[in-house]
Amino acid sequence: ISCSLVGSEMCIRDRHHIHFASPPYTSLRAKLKVRDLARELVEYTGNCTLFVVPYTKPQEYIRDNAPDVLFTVLMRRSMLRIANQVAKKLELQALITGESIGQVASQTMQSLAVTNEVCELPVMRPLIAFDKQDIVDISLKIGTYETSVLPYEDCCTIFVAKHPVTKPNLNVIKCSERHLDDVIDEMMERAVSTAETIEVC
C-alpha cells in the first residue's frame, strides 16, 4: 500500500493508496486533490483503490499528550502502524512512502529508523536518495505536478512542532508512547475500521 503517489509511480504495480485526513483541519478539497492525483496515475498503475483514513482523533491525542518536540516522530509512527494494519487486512506485502533523506526533520536517518521500527511489513522508499528538484521533475514527467502544488493543507502541515527532534532516541520515543496508553491504540483501530474506500479509475 502506498503513502506516496510519486513513490507509487516508481513502484508501478502498486494499486492501493492511503490518505490521512484530519477534518476540520484538513478540508474536503484536500481529499479531492489526493483523489485527483490518484486518477492522474491510473495511466501508469491501472485502476486503483484510495483509502481515506480519518486521522483527527489520533493526531489531536498525540498533540495534547506528548512532548511537542516528539510530536512529528510519534505521529509518523502512528501513521505507519495504521498503514500496516490496512495493508495486512488487504493481504499486501509492503508499504511504499515518498520520503527522501534530509528533506524535513522527520526524514533524517535517525528519524526514519525510529519510524520504521513499528512496522511489521517492509517499507519501500523509492525516492530515498532524490532531492526536491528530482521529485519535482518526476511529477512534471508523469503529469501530477500542477495538482500536487494546489495549496490545500494536509495532516503533516498542521500542529507542526516548533523544534522537532531530528535525532530521536528509540527508548525515549517508546517511553512517550507508553504514556499515551491504550487510548491511542483504540483510536488507531477505529481509524482503520472506519476508513473510506474510493475506487479510482
Predicted regions and their residues:
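Extended, hydrophobic alpha-helical segments in both membrane/secreted and soluble proteins
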Residues: 2-4, 17, 34, 135
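Short secondary-structure boundary segments
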Residues: 22, 98-99, 148-151
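Short hydrophobic alpha-helical runs that function as membrane-insertion/retention elements
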Residues: 15-18, 124-125, 148
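A glycine-rich phosphate-binding loop feature that marks nucleotide/adenosyl-phosphate handling sites
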Residues: 53-58, 100-101, 153-162
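Cysteine-dependent PTP/DSP-like catalytic domain, specifically the C-terminal lobe
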Residues: 13-57
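Active-site adenylate/phosphate-handling loop in enzymes that bind or generate adenylated species
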Residues: 41, 55, 59-137, 141-142, ...
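Single conserved hydrophobic/aromatic residue that forms the stacking wall/gate
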Residues: 1-12
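Peripheral terminal appendages
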Residues: 9, 48, 92, 108, ...
